[in-house]
Design a protein with these regions (language model features):
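Hydrolase active-site cap/lid region
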Residues: 111-151
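Conserved alpha/beta-hydrolase "acid-adjacent" motif
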Residues: 181-187
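Short beta-strand/loop motif that positions the catalytic acidic residue
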Residues: 168-169, 174-176, 180
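The serine-hydrolase catalytic nucleophile loop
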Residues: 32-45, 186
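Conserved alpha/beta-hydrolase
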Residues: 47-66
Length: 232
């Protein structure tokens, strides 16, 4: 694994590059208030099993960043995602690109489908926010009522981000956890519907990958994602 920086407008973000083959690259987007270290176990497994290279970024305000995450907007994090994707295309011009996002990172990955073309989309417990939240400072986002609107089918059916999902031309996989405290089944069901996605169900799991699930269940979870990525 190599540590590197991705240049953005006027600053840079940290990233880890897992080197596999040159023909496939996976962009990995972590969740809110998380970091690239949290993605190491799953990413290492996918690199070993599929032969893909992988780039794991760390948003501004996360990890060792000097910025305050609460003073950053999701829109700024999305520009960082764009910069990372474009770095991949520059460094691996002939590679098949896949994107895997977890929770907030899943929300970012879905935003990316509007602006960049890629082959595979993996959404692990993907979050969703109100349209105005995308341009709000994180400190102004009402996180106390997130689950309420994520369970609201009218909200989900009218959300512009989901309305344009059908234009995505690649494959999609949605991973959902039975006991998720933050992303309810209504949200993951809607993502499955709009992307015509395959799905993987983690019975008894809460939101975080770091659960009390038995080791064999964790291995099955990782293998399911790996096997899906290896499909053509």
């Amino acid at each position: 694994m190599k540590n590197l920086v991705i240049d953005c407008v006027g600053y840079s973000i940290d990233a880890d590059l897992y080197e596999g083959g040159d023909d496939k690259v996976l962009l990995v987007l972590h969740g809110w208030n998380s970091n690239k270290k949290s993605q190491e176990e799953l990413t290492s497994y996918l690199v070993d099993e599929t032969g893909t290279s992988a780039l794991v970024i760390e948003y501004s305000g996360h990890g060792k960043s000097s910025l305050d995450a609460m003073e950053v907007r999701p829109a700024q994090h999305f520009l960082e995602v764009i910069a990372a994707f474009d770095w991949i295309k520059e460094e691996y011009p002939n590679a098949e690109v896949s994107v895997m996002g977890t929770s907030y990172g899943g929300y970012m990955a879905v935003q990316l489908t509007k602006y960049r073309d890629f082959k595979n989309l993996i959404l692990r417990v993907p979050a969703i926010y109100t349209p105005r939240d995308f341009y709000s400072l994180n400190k102004d986002i009402d996180r106390q009522h997130e689950r309420r609107y994520r369970e609201d089918k009218d909200f989900l059916n009218s959300h512009p981000l989901l309305a344009r999902a059908s234009k995505f031309q690649g494959r999609a996989l949605v991973v959902w956890h039975e006991l998720d405290e933050y992303v309810p089944k209504e949200t993951t069901d809607k993502y499955i519907e709009v992307f015509n996605a395959d799905s993987y169900f983690a019975k008894g799991w809460k939101h975080s990958f770091k659960t009390d699930a038995p080791k064999d269940e964790q291995e099955a979870y990782k293998k399911a994602i790996s096997d899906w990525l290896k499909q053509q």
